[in-house]
């Protein structure tokens, strides 16, 4: 039997598994079955806690989408990861350092129960996002057979394009998201953010995630939106980001500096499952 915990960060929900004290392996097919909301546990991502590869770090953090594919990073998941390892007694630290396939992250448990995550320095060089463009720009034109879109692009360990919208509540997220997530200029696919700027310290955001469709919240998407908004001169250093599942606070001092994201991490239940 495998012990697991169901958690969520703003409704972005996870199956979290301790791979430190348990010997676990999940095939893509098993992950797809477990992710099914009718026949399985149901989740957006599976988070796996593994022992660190580097003695200076506390854990290795792996993320699998509901389609079974492994991805580089998940900000909402990182907050749940921090709360999980602390709740399960895998560490007694308030500041936790982890590696992911995209690099290293620092997670900080706050006194009010929220978790602050150092999301790293955003990548703006198109070749590193990866995104097909001659050079880094504030905005890019994305052409599709139906229409042309203006977007910003950045990577937070995973690729994002961000569109400015007048009214996020009525944005055609499902259709445009599905169209752009597989756009040929993003060789590894892309997460698509729909950003409404309320004022320079406040945005509303919906995100169509690569491999998962629209989710209630996307931490890396919130970071990417703030980066794009700041570069375009629309946003301040600290920004409140309202997502369908709740609110995150993002702090960024500008190019070359890491982003800090603060938000909740909720425990839902503990369970066990036979694979």
Curated annotation (Swiss-Prot):
<comment type="subunit">
    <text>Homodimer.</text>
</comment>
<feature type="site" description="Important for dimerization">
    <location>
        <position position="269"/>
    </location>
</feature>
<dbReference type="GO" id="GO:0005829">
    <property type="term" value="C:cytosol"/>
</dbReference>
<dbReference type="Pfam" id="PF01678">
    <property type="entry name" value="DAP_epimerase"/>
</dbReference>
<keyword id="KW-0963">Cytoplasm</keyword>
<comment type="similarity">
    <text>Belongs to the diaminopimelate epimerase family.</text>
</comment>
<feature type="binding site">
    <location>
        <begin position="219"/>
        <end position="220"/>
    </location>
    <ligand>
        <name>substrate</name>
    </ligand>
</feature>
<dbReference type="GO" id="GO:0008837">
    <property type="term" value="F:diaminopimelate epimerase activity"/>
</dbReference>
<keyword id="KW-0028">Amino-acid biosynthesis</keyword>
<feature type="active site" description="Proton donor">
    <location>
        <position position="74"/>
    </location>
</feature>
<feature type="binding site">
    <location>
        <position position="158"/>
    </location>
    <ligand>
        <name>substrate</name>
    </ligand>
</feature>
<feature type="binding site">
    <location>
        <position position="191"/>
    </location>
    <ligand>
        <name>substrate</name>
    </ligand>
</feature>
<feature type="binding site">
    <location>
        <position position="45"/>
    </location>
    <ligand>
        <name>substrate</name>
    </ligand>
</feature>
<feature type="binding site">
    <location>
        <begin position="209"/>
        <end position="210"/>
    </location>
    <ligand>
        <name>substrate</name>
    </ligand>
</feature>
<keyword id="KW-0413">Isomerase</keyword>
<protein>
    <recommendedName>
        <fullName>Diaminopimelate epimerase</fullName>
        <ecNumber>5.1.1.7</ecNumber>
    </recommendedName>
</protein>
<dbReference type="GO" id="GO:0009089">
    <property type="term" value="P:lysine biosynthetic process via diaminopimelate"/>
</dbReference>
<feature type="binding site">
    <location>
        <position position="65"/>
    </location>
    <ligand>
        <name>substrate</name>
    </ligand>
</feature>
<feature type="site" description="Could be important to modulate the pK values of the two catalytic cysteine residues">
    <location>
        <position position="160"/>
    </location>
</feature>
<keyword id="KW-0457">Lysine biosynthesis</keyword>
<feature type="site" description="Could be important to modulate the pK values of the two catalytic cysteine residues">
    <location>
        <position position="209"/>
    </location>
</feature>
<feature type="binding site">
    <location>
        <begin position="75"/>
        <end position="76"/>
    </location>
    <ligand>
        <name>substrate</name>
    </ligand>
</feature>
<comment type="function">
    <text>Catalyzes the stereoinversion of LL-2,6-diaminopimelate (L,L-DAP) to meso-diaminopimelate (meso-DAP), a precursor of L-lysine and an essential component of the bacterial peptidoglycan.</text>
</comment>
<comment type="pathway">
    <text>Amino-acid biosynthesis; L-lysine biosynthesis via DAP pathway; DL-2,6-diaminopimelate from LL-2,6-diaminopimelate: step 1/1.</text>
</comment>
<dbReference type="InterPro" id="IPR001653">
    <property type="entry name" value="DAP_epimerase_DapF"/>
</dbReference>
<dbReference type="InterPro" id="IPR018510">
    <property type="entry name" value="DAP_epimerase_AS"/>
</dbReference>
<feature type="active site" description="Proton acceptor">
    <location>
        <position position="218"/>
    </location>
</feature>
<feature type="binding site">
    <location>
        <position position="12"/>
    </location>
    <ligand>
        <name>substrate</name>
    </ligand>
</feature>
């Amino acid at each position: 039997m495998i012990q697991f915990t169901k958690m969520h960060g703003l409704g972005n929900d996870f199956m979290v598994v301790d791979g430190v004290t348990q010997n676990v392996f999940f095939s893509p097919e098993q992950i797809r079955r477990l992710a099914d909301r009718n026949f399985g546990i149901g989740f957006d991502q599976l988070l796996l806690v593994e022992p660190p590869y580097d003695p200076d770090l506390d854990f290795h953090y792996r993320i699998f989408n509901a389609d079974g594919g492994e991805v580089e990073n998940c900000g909402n998941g990182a907050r749940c990861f921090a709360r999980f390892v602390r709740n399960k007694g895998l560490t007694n630290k308030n500041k936790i350092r982890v590696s992911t396939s995209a690099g290293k992250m620092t997670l900080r448990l706050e006194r009010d129960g929220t978790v602050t995550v150092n999301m790293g320095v955003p990548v703006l060089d198109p070749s590193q996002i990866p995104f097909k463009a001659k050079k880094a720009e504030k905005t890019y034109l994305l052409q599709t057979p139906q229409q042309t879109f203006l977007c910003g692009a950045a990577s937070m360990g995973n690729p994002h394009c961000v569109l400015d919208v007048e009214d996020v509540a009525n944005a055609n997220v499902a259709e445009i998201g599905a169209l752009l997530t597989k756009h040929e200029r993003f060789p590894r696919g892309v997460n698509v953010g729909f950003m409404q700027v309320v004022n320079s310290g406040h945005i509303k955001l919906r995100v169509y995630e690569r491999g998962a469709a629209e989710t209630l919240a996307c931490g890396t998407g919130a970071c990417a939106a703030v980066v794009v908004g700041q570069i375009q001169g629309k946003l301040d250093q600290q920004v409140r980001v309202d997502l369908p599942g709740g609110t995150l606070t993002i702090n960024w001092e500008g190019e070359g500096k890491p982003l800090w994201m603060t938000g909740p991490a909720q425990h839902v239940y503990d369970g066990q499952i036979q694979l």
